[in-house]
Amino acid sequence: FRSSAASDVYKRQELIEAVKELELDEIVDILQNLPEERMNKILSNMSLVDRKRIEIGLTFPDNTAGGLLNTDVISVRPNNSINEVISYLRDQEELPENTDKIFVVNNENEYLGELLISRILTSKPTMLVREIMETEFLPIDAGLDDKEVATIFERNNLISSSVVDKDGKLIGRITIDDVVDVIREDADQNLLG
């Protein structure tokens, strides 16, 4: 009995460590397929920040933008200077994968626009975010069907896009690698189907 219990603890700890190495959207995909009790055990062993981020993803069906989103997102305020943004970015251990832009939000976390990394690098340090941010491209609604998300990415040649909830608050982003998975699944279904 003891060796079995010890083995279970070891396996659980091994699973928790393996999960920590995955992207948050991949963790959500795995957790959605586990029994609720096991999912809750894994969540309870995560940091509060990671748990909250994962719980956001778990609230959406996996065939929606919300199911694809990753909460590893960088956002800034419109009144920040470019110098402040650069300093903030340097303070990060690393940028999230496929970061080609950061998002601009107000104090209530409502999406206002996006700021391309290339614009940050080529703008004067004293300029304000609001002076150079892009506002034309609308964020993706979390409830949008994943195939429609793929179409938006394809049509606009996107690497990443913001995702907002029904109130327009930034809740994450979708990156091209997630969209490629949707395209592959759709192609496989069409091939078999």
Task: Indicate residue ranges for each PLM-predicted region.
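The conserved cystathionine-beta-synthase
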Residues: 19-23, 28-34, 77-98, 140-157
